A protein has these predicted regions:
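Phosphate-ester processing/binding pockets and catalytic centers
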Residues: 1-254
Length: 254
């Protein structure tokens, strides 16, 4: 089950063809839709409608289950057209958005006083190994990474998404963020699909982590969804900014 299939534009179009069907009628027509797919026959209009409504109801049901079980949403978004530079740092280090994601996950675990696992969707073994290498370097070779390993178990688990329901739920949430969640004041202002924003945006807002973080000696509000305009740009701390300001020569006046 993929979010891109469950909530594609056709499903919304089919669901809106007729009034909402009673549960039993919808189930009957959904079975007809799936059976005709196996038989290579064309479904009739009520079957398309039932299948579309069933897909949307399933997505809503997943979000309801996540809320009932106190799930918390974490996501790091980057612009679609970002290209990875050909540099040693890009090859060997975690991207900035990945570090920010771990940061927020750490704040949540620290708040809950619980250890947390990293469960990944297995994609391609060579790329997965490269990611593990970057992750190990972060947790072993950086002071921040070693500190955060107090709550984050620094060894990820890889699973097949088609056999793991939580990964499928995460995929649905990611798809809804991609198309229906924006942070315009922070530069995350790409066009949305209105039907996703209106139907599932409130679920994302409810599930998003909210807590407190700390950096450079200060405490600030932290949220589970973060937008990173350039995931390969070097991060500059407040201390470094202050040192840079002090090192500048005074401006001469005329």
């Amino acid at each position: 089950m993929k979010g891109c299939k469950l909530l594609d534009k056709d499903r919304f179009k089919w669901a809106a063809q007729e009034q909402t069907m009673p549960d039993e009628e919808r189930r009957k027509h959904c079975r007809g839709f799936l059976t005709k797919g196996l038989e290579r026959k064309s479904p009739i209009r009520p079957e398309f409608t039932a299948y579309g409504q069933g897909c949307l109801d399933m997505a809503t049901g997943i979000f309801e289950l996540l809320r009932q079980h106190n799930a918390r949403l974490f996501a790091a978004a980057i612009p679609r057209k970002v290209a990875r530079p050909v540099t040693f740092e890009a090859e060997e280090y975690l991207r900035k958005d990945q570090v920010f994601l771990l940061e927020r996950y750490f704040y949540f675990l620290e708040q809950q006083k619980q250890h947390g696992l990293l469960v990944m969707d297995a994609v391609e073994k060579n790329e997965d190994r490269r990611f593990v290498r970057r992750l190990e370097a972060y947790f072993r070779k950086t002071q921040t990474g070693r500190y955060r390993s107090a709550w984050i178990v620094p060894a990820p688990l890889f699973v097949s998404s088609d056999m793991t329901y939580p990964i499928q739920a995460a995929d649905l949430a990611i798809y809804c963020i991609n198309w229906g969640f924006r942070l315009p004041k922070r530069g995350m202002d790409a066009p949305v699909r209105t039907e996703i924003a209106e139907n599932y945006g409130r679920w994302l807002a409810q599930l998003q982590f909210r807590g407190e973080g700390n950096r450079d000696g200060g405490v600030f509000d932290s949220y589970g969804v973060v937008f990173v305009p350039d995931p390969y740009a070097a991060r500059v701390s407040q201390k470094q900014r202050e040192e840079a300001m002090l090192s500048k020569p005074p401006e001469s006046s005329t």
